[in-house]
Amino acid sequence: MSNKGQTLQDPFLNTLRKEHVPVSIYLVNGIKLQGQIESFDQYVVLLRNTVTQMVYKHAISTVVPARAVNFQVEVPAE
């Protein structure tokens, strides 16, 4: 994954995690998962509901927060 992808997704996912925002995660096969983001890394997201699920990022189509979130994107010096 490119650096630009990480500079967008990491602050977004981290804000959702820190603020305990409920999310709907849609997978590429159309399945909808709901819960709160517990943790994430380069390849997976841990989604907590009644149980914690490990969801591979390559299977995720869309992440939809239950409410609007504000997050800061750090622009790397070029």
Curated annotation (Swiss-Prot):
Q: In the UniProt record, does the keyword RNA-binding occur? A: yes
Question: In the UniProt record, does the keyword ATP-binding occur?
Answer: no
Example GO CC term: the record gives:
cytosol
Q: Which UniProt keywords apply?
A: RNA-binding, Stress response
MF annotations from Gene Ontology: RNA binding
Every Sm domain range: 10-69
- Give the matching Pfam families: Hfq
The UniProt entry, under PROSITE patterns, shows:
SM (PS52002)
Q: What GO terms in the biological process aspect are recorded for it?
A: regulation of DNA-templated transcription; regulation of RNA stability; regulation of translation, ncRNA-mediated
Superkingdom assignment: Bacteria
Question: What quaternary arrangement does the UniProt entry report?
Answer: Homohexamer.
Function as written in the Swiss-Prot or TrEMBL entry: RNA chaperone that binds small regulatory RNA (sRNAs) and mRNAs to facilitate mRNA translational regulation in response to envelope stress, environmental stress and changes in metabolite concentrations. Also binds with high specificity to tRNAs.
> Record's family?
Belongs to the Hfq family.
Name of the featured protein: RNA-binding protein Hfq
